Amino acid sequence: MRLRNKPWAKEKIAAYPQYVIPNPEEHKGRWNELFGNDHPIHIEIGTGKGKFITEMAKANPNINYIGIELYPSVLVSALDKLIENELPNLRLLNVNAKDLTNFFAEGEIERIYLNFSDPWPKKRHEKRRLTYRAFLELYEKVLVDEGEIHFKTDNQAFFEYSLVSFSQYGLVLTYVSLDLHNSDFEGNVMTEYEEKFSAKGNRIYRCEVKYPPKHQKAGL
């Protein structure tokens, strides 16, 4: 994806610390205090322009959402949506997902959304894929016992790779669709990217996986 540079994006993000949390490591293990409740927390890694997570937060007021996006020029669009909607159960982070354990304590997150992540198709870039084993290990550290990953992509090769990666790690597949928009799945919330590519007739792939119970993985 080619990004359009917005030199003013960082300045705008810095002007809204109540929405884009500037020092997320200070809230590690205490995100419930920031939200002012003990509702479950769901995060989206690669939140993009924010349509998905904004709509999810609107539809589910009893769930707290955190959108993570590395690029300020993209995140600023999600910030605009949050400013407009003033959602108390949504906050944003302008950080790198590889540092996830710096920001969240063990068992602090209930679910992770991966929507249309960069497939990094070249073999030498495999370690950058958000469904690579090292990332699955990272997610397990912050997720609750039997925590979930919900994954969507329009890239068949990346989807197949991810299914294998999930299986090899021991994740349990609880839902899969090879053509989401022609399935019986209800409640799908589309991203901007998803709207664009599904309108062209592109097939959307989706799956849900969960980690096995930790005592089971430990062989107890």
From Swiss-Prot:
It comes from the Bacteria. It catalyses: guanosine(46) in tRNA + S-adenosyl-L-methionine = N(7)-methylguanosine(46) in tRNA + S-adenosyl-L-homocysteine. Substrate binds at K122, D154, T191, E192, Y193, E194. PROSITE patterns: SAM_MT_TRMB. NCBIfam families: PRK00121.2-2 (NF001080), tRNA (guanosine(46)-N7)-methyltransferase TrmB (TIGR00091). PANTHER family: 3-DEOXY-D-MANNO-OCTULOSONIC-ACID TRANSFERASE/TRNA GUANINE-N 7 - -METHYLTRANSFERASE, PENTACOTRIPEPTIDE-REPEAT REGION OF PRORP DOMAIN-CONTAINING PROTEIN. HAMAP family: tRNA_methyltr_TrmB. This is tRNA (guanine-N(7)-)-methyltransferase. It comes from Geobacillus sp. (strain WCH70). The lineage of its organism: Bacteria, Bacillati, Bacillota, Bacilli, Bacillales.
